[in-house]
């Protein structure tokens, strides 16, 4: 698990942001609990995530796990029908298009896109456009 001082710092960040710790867990200003679900496709990851989940619960966060088959997982990813997923984003040795697909605002709400986090930020878009416009490897590396 996470060291106690790190958990204390995390709780301070949450309380500074307006969350209140109560017997029902972390509550927002409307007394709604902080809760989310982690969507998995591999049941072996459940065991790996347990220390993380236990730490979140220590903070008063109600977190659950849902493991589904590959078809349902893909369908839910494509529709952005999840709170959190555990995945890796494949990269190439020449950065460019995949970063645009993962992080560009134009991809944030398109079903089936790869911008799973729903990032929509003009600063990120400008950086990605600079990356795609790079003419040399040095420019590409600097932009990445």
Task: State what each model feature region is.
Residues 40, 82, 103-104:
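Alpha-helix boundary/capping detector
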Residues 95-99:
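Short beta-strand-centered segments that line the small-molecule binding cleft or hinge
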Residues 42-46, 70-72, 90-94:
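Solvent-exposed loop/turn segments at secondary-structure junctions
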Residues 26-27, 68, 89:
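Proline- and acidic/polar-enriched loop/turn elements at helix boundaries
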Residues 83-88:
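Paired acidic/hydrophobic, glycine-rich loop segments that form the ligand-binding mouth/hinge
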Residues 1-54, 120-127:
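Append "and occasionally in soluble cytosolic enzymes with long acidic Gly/Pro-rich linkers
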Residues 1-3, 12, 58-74, 78, ...:
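Extracytoplasmic/peripheral linker and loop segments enriched in polar/acidic and small residues
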């Amino acid at each position: 698990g996470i060291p106690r001082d790190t958990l204390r710092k995390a709780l301070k960040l949450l309380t500074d942001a307006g969350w209140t710790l109560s017997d029902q867990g972390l509550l927002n200003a409307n007394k709604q609990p902080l809760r989310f679900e982690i969507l998995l496709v591999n049941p072996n990851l459940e065991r790996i995530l347990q220390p993380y989940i236990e730490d979140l619960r220590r903070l008063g966060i109600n977190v659950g796990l849902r493991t589904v088959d590959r078809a349902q997982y893909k369908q839910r990813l494509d529709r952005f029908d999840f709170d959190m997923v555990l995945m890796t984003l494949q990269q190439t040795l020449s950065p460019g298009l995949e970063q645009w697909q993962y992080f560009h605002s134009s991809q944030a709400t398109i079903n089936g896109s790869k911008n799973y986090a729903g990032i929509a930020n003009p600063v990120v878009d400008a950086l990605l456009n600079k990356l795609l416009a790079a003419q040399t490897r040095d420019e590409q590396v600097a932009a990445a």
